[in-house]
Amino acid sequence: MMPVQAIRRVAQYLLATNVVLGALFFAGCETVPQGIQQARVEMTQQIAAEPTGDYYIGRRYYKPDYKFWGYVRKAGQPWSTAELVMLNEKEKLAPDRERLEFGSDNNYEYKLYGDFSGDKVYEPASNGIYPEFVLKGYELISTTPTPIFKSQMSGRSNPTDLRYVVEKPE
């Protein structure tokens, strides 16, 4: 049988361990800053109010080492439904390529005209296969749209740290 002091020591150790683990658990929980939270609420309302039509919404997602174009979603659908696409530019060049300023439009939001071809395209840097979007035209919506990536919302969107990270919109 264990002496009472040994039992107390074990109980104190277990309590201290639980407190430390609890603190670590809650430290990992992030809250979204109030301004960004309000902007996301407004973005959700704007998306819901988008008129239906023969167009898509695209967010340029430029990574120097990758060849995908960015995320594309149907009008009226949330960003969580968007697909990372390879752009077919046979009919229309991408905005940055038209200006010969590759990647200069990172995070810009566009109204895109075109369609998914149904084909899948291999992208070697990410070792991923992405749907092909055939671009026929575009209109710039915003150069400073509401954040859709976790790194943008947390304020930790350091390009060096995220160079090889492919984020998904939330």
Indicate residue ranges for each PLM-predicted region.
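N-terminal hydrophobic targeting signals that begin at the initiator methionine
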Residues: M2-P3, E30
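Bacterial N-terminal signal peptides that target proteins for export
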Residues: P3-T17
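C-terminal motif of bacterial Sec signal peptides marking the signal peptidase cleavage site
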Residues: F25-G28
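OB-fold and OB-like single-stranded nucleic-acid-recognition modules
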Residues: T31-E170
